[in-house]
Amino acid sequence: MTKLEQRITLADDFYLYDTPGVLWPRIIVEKSGYNLAASGAIGVNAFDDEEVALELLHYLIPKYPQALALRYKIKDVSSHTDETMLEAIARFRGAIQSGGRVNNTKAAEIVIHDFRSAALGRLTLETPAEFAEWLASGLQADADRALRKEALQKEKKTARKAKPKN
């Protein structure tokens, strides 16, 4: 992700400029929203750390089990769900509250920080094929939402017209 403008020299007289992009006002691909939050592109107040960490783990467990095993010394990563993995990470990193309860918020912060700082390694959260699939389902959900909204507006308009005037 590009945070600052960069000038990359490709040849003596040929440069590539990498500049930060602009986020669209409404994210219709839910997974992209989680990925943007995990990467730090979305402000902290716009998401819940625990939810983002669970979504991140849900993706990383099947795709990068070796990275999780190496970083958190967890055996048989693939047998974990995102929730049990977060709990195991909390126990490994000492994110325990009084009474031995797991501090999920602290564990989530650890997972997100480790991802952003590349402590888990260089990981990719989406491929072009995955994004195309997510986009198709996001566009369909958005179209369905628009149809429901339109039907609701028509219903309200009809109800207002049918209401007797005094």
Language model features: what each stretch is:
Residues 1-166:
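Helix-rich effector regions associated with P-loop NTPase G domains
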